[in-house]
């Protein structure tokens, strides 16, 4: 009798526990997205961002800068080891991060009329140890495309080729998981934009051969280690690049940037054809899409945020069409239209936008249905979490208008106050928001 009584109690308690674990109650969350989200939005250069931080600091999440190999490379050992001093780049990252922003970086060799290497116009950013080699010979154009004096890296030089690959290996090893860096843009030619407008293209001299370009793309895919990397949409041009005719390269998950976005002839013209050729309408699903508002006309940057649109198209329309995650618009605040509030609105028209459509808990677990109501996916890992307990399902890659079901091995509070999105890819000052209305 005593044994039977004990068994009865055990079964009764077990029944209560099973009943408890199967009782799911709604979590009455009420959240709003209040501003641009990390790794998205309109972008300023550091000088502009620094000067406008009081008024525009909350309107942006990203800043852009070119990065010069000659500023971080001190030399090369006899065994081929590149000697670096990253302090210049570290100062740049720290400056941007001090405003709660992340960097979009682009390495380049050529910049027509650029003086940021040595104060002289058009000097390449090739490291000095390569320039001092007897087998390295740069070429020069006095005014290609009307952009001013330009020197060109010597792509016949095998050490330049080797160094270029090694630079990205070493850079990605050091910075791929650094939260101060959001995205990396790469390429060749003027501004690394995959063209030499106004100058004659000479493979293996002023531009890398298609064979080396292929090697470079495959190398980037190998070393990026989760860091989203982008190339110019101009890489779709068969004159310069092998990409669109190479199935293996087209299958890589690189993103795209367009540095003359929304110019007068953009739609239906060369730029849109480039997007279609190299993007195929689906590249945005795995690769970040961004760029810079056009400088073709002085009004392009200053008026693209006009509610009436620019050349018949609004910013919101174009951001949606091309699934834009970020866009440089450094001169926009000087035009009168792009107030801090309008800049904030423009930033919020890009990227991802997470919405919790349903959330419930049984006290020990939480499950929710999450949708992306933005124009692009998130390209780096982030997770919903209850307290310190993360979901095993990353939000990375959730496409616009798609939903996913997420479970977390912890119980949410009744109001969901302990539910957040966490990511190792954002700064401590940043927070990925989500919207949720009481269910």
What is each residue range found by the language model?
Residues 1-7:
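Bacterial N-terminal signal peptides that target proteins for export
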Residues 11-20:
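Hydrophobic h-region of N-terminal signal peptides that target proteins for export
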Residues 22-159, 282-320, 324-338:
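N-terminal substrate-binding region of glycoside hydrolase catalytic domains
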Residues 24-51, 97-99, 183-333:
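Catalytic-core regions of glycoside hydrolase
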Residues 63, 96, 171, 184, ...:
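Conserved, mostly hydrophobic/aromatic
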Residues 71-74, 111-118, 125, 190-196, ...:
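Short catalytic/ligand-binding loop motif for oxyanion handling, primarily in non-cytosolic enzymes
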Residues 136-160, 164-206:
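Active-site groove signature of glycoside hydrolases
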Residues 348-439:
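Extracellular/luminal regions of secreted and cell-surface proteins that mediate adhesion/ECM remodeling
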